[in-house]
């Protein structure tokens, strides 16, 4: 790695205070400078019971801002959607906290108030945590998104990938009016999406008109096409982006007729009968099920939340419809292979169960078990706003997902898209691996071009199309690094390259995260050290240096987890021993 490369700077943060309504006086807030949430000394925890109350944020007006403390937007409170609430905190709903409802900030700060002009105390050793690295933590990302409307990741340089473009399927869109198109070409500081929703003199006021949505495009005759040719990557849609326009002058429209059009050309690749076909398959779903609700749409599928048609034995399922148009780009054989793989994996308790499959109007429907607690990505994002996950819980999640991958690999399949958003959480808090859209059998043909999420993709897939079992181990290791360190993994750029080259210098040390707290037991430090060592082996740049799933399950740590774990994967549980007989 070039030593002159500039490390991304962590954005300035300001203080944030938590308050639980009906528990404390709002004029006496508990702040981040108090004691941490966890007290790891056994036998010294106070068994307190607190009534559940609404979690809100506020910022006292008499408090000075500090550049070292994260701030939450006081206009919005955190909304935890995961129903297994007690799995987030220690001893169910914050029992055992040294101070009730005092959340740890992840930084061990002094109680003095500092600002941007305060000199740095060089004698005091700074704590190495997830908030002091070049990578953003989940809490920092949330604060950055609240303060900025744009995605901070989009400003990073692109990461070279083997695919030149990614076609995104969209429903048919209403065409732009001539006035809107001309103004979009002339006004450089106009947002096309915002302007298309303004009231125009000749616009149709009917409620049935479609809203304009941006489609993937290229600006022919401009620099966009040159950038696309110079850097091969998964291209993102290119649109006009600038400040919002509140008013405009109609008399400026004719003068734009003589301008050379350089605005994006929007192309619609869907047929005009897509809406009629959607009505056909939804009507078929309503015949088979009741309470059919769409919950998600991706490039190649629709996902519906349905329930059985017999009320006495009502059961909730998820129906995934593989789009017919998607088969033109991925091949119908890919859809049939996904069905075949899911049918072979029905015996594994850590893989989403396929209940039924059928075809209607050339569209394939998959009926799957419903996981009530959403996906692991959502759980990590919500937990990351409050605290860093304890290493023992990460071990439990790693154990369950390793069993899922081991079952898949024994049948000579590879998943190729392991990431937290494809890991589902059941009602009791256990994990199941889903989304086998990229899964395939081994050996993978050289003609096959498969590529998962670039955040979790293994380096050998991009370098030499080497699809194998180690690629799944690498993606699982990165997913567990995200869970253990509470950082936002980079999509591209310098940090992306460092992780693929085995450079973990900007990742927080799990041992230091524990030592920043008081009264940490030695067994917990050993648990964190062994976890960090294993995750670095799983994400090794060289394929031969990574352990297999069978090697992982044979480790003493995995055997200890299988014998001593009493609760589900995402539920906190305290152990006074680690690898002790």
Curated annotation (Swiss-Prot):
Residues holding Mg(2+): 422, 435
Cell division keyword on record: yes
Listed Polar residues bias regions: 59-71
Comp. bias intervals (Basic residues): 160-169
Domain Protein kinase: 289-561
GO cellular component terms listed in the entry, alphabetical order: cytoplasm; cytosol; nucleus
Alphabetical list of Gene3D superfamilies matching this protein: Phosphorylase Kinase, domain 1 (3.30.200.20), Transferase(Phosphotransferase) domain 1 (1.10.510.10)
EC identifiers of the protein: 2.7.11.1
Residues that bind ATP: 295-303, 320
Catalytically driven reaction(s): L-seryl-[protein] + ATP = O-phospho-L-seryl-[protein] + ADP + H(+); L-threonyl-[protein] + ATP = O-phospho-L-threonyl-[protein] + ADP + H(+)
One Pfam match: Pkinase
Active-site residue numbers: 417 (proton acceptor)
SUPFAM superfamilies named in the record: Protein kinase-like (PK-like)
GO biological process, one term: cell division
Region (Disordered): 43-71, 148-178
Record GO terms (molecular function): ATP binding; metal ion binding; protein serine kinase activity; protein serine/threonine kinase activity; protein tyrosine kinase activity
Record keywords, A-Z: ATP-binding, Cell cycle, Cell division, Kinase, Magnesium, Metal-binding, Mitosis, Nucleotide-binding, Serine/threonine-protein kinase, Transferase, Tyrosine-protein kinase
Similarity remark: Belongs to the protein kinase superfamily. Ser/Thr protein kinase family. WEE1 subfamily.
Free-text function comment from the UniProt entry: Protein kinase that acts both on serines and on tyrosines. It acts as a negative regulator of entry into mitosis (G2 to M transition). Phosphorylates and inhibits cdc2.
Listed name of the protein: Mitosis inhibitor protein kinase mik1
Organism (species): Schizosaccharomyces pombe (strain 972 / ATCC 24843)
